[in-house]
Amino acid sequence: MGTYKYQAEIDVLIQQGLKMPEVVKPNDLKGFRFVFSSDMSKSYLPNYIMKPQRAIMNGQRKVDVGGYALSCFIEKDKAIKFYHLLAKNMRNIYKTIGDSISSGIVTNNDGNITALASNGHYNLFEFPSCDLSKTFKLEEGKLWKQ
């Protein structure tokens, strides 16, 4: 499995009874990720690092170890489709998950990934040295226009 960038935080959730998902090596898998075009610094942080209160189990929402992983898709079209599906129920989606897409290659040195979901989604559990902001590039065009 390995030690991940947010291993201490993951361990807290595991101690609370949550399970780490099955993971595999990415083997140079293409990745597409939602990003904030105006603030790339927070674009490569997991959900629970950006908003730590989301990792607190209070019975109101489902907490998942994947909150300490980076969400990616294998195809740009699938990412766009998912974004627009979410946008139907999230009025300010561009503030929550971003307004654009970046892409790059996820290598075995970056971390381990979960199995691909039917919509092409996977989570990347980063190794400590991983920094996708250095290897992923912003795609042209915005998903959300304010």
Model-derived features: positions:
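ADP-ribose/NAD+-binding catalytic cleft of ART/PARP-like enzymes
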Residues: 1-64, 146
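Intrinsically disordered, low-complexity segments enriched in small/polar residues
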Residues: 2-4, 46, 120, 125, ...
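Intrinsic disorder/low-complexity signal
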Residues: 8-10, 74, 139
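Generic detection of intrinsically disordered/low-complexity segments and helix-coil linkers/edges
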Residues: 26-28, 38, 42, 67, ...
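ADP-ribosyltransferase catalytic core
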Residues: 57-129
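Charged phosphate-binding loop/patch that engages nucleotide di/tri-phosphates or the phosphate backbone
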Residues: 125-146
